[in-house]
From Swiss-Prot:
Belongs to the histatin/statherin family. Keywords: Biomineralization, Phosphoprotein, Secreted, Signal. Disulfide bonds: none annotated. The gene is STATH. It comes from the Eukaryota. It is found in: Secreted. The modification Phosphoserine is found at S21, S22. This is Statherin. One of its GO terms (molecular function) is hydroxyapatite binding. InterPro entries: Histatin/statherin, Statherin. Salivary protein that stabilizes saliva supersaturated with calcium salts by inhibiting the precipitation of calcium phosphate salts. It also modulates hydroxyapatite crystal formation on the tooth surface. GO terms for cellular component: extracellular region. Residues 1-19 form the signal peptide.
Length: 59
């Protein structure tokens, strides 16, 4: 009985983690500004701000 209870708790934890990560993926796919909730809008670059650190990143 203890094993079934433990398996149920583990399955619940895995389901909650998957639900949370899929929600984040869904929000980022449609509007990346929700990743930064304090930002009111605008473009979020996916590269570091100028000046680049040495050595320069390979693209």
């Amino acid at each position: 009985m203890k094993i079934f209870f433990f398996a149920f708790i583990m399955a619940l934890m895995v389901a909650m983690i998957k639900a949370d990560s899929s929600e984040e993926e869904h929000r980022l796919r449609f509007n990346p500004r929700f990743y930064y909730p304090n930002q009111q809008g605008g473009y979020i670059p996916s590269y570091p701000a100028y000046p680049y650190p040495y050595p320069y990143p390979v693209q």
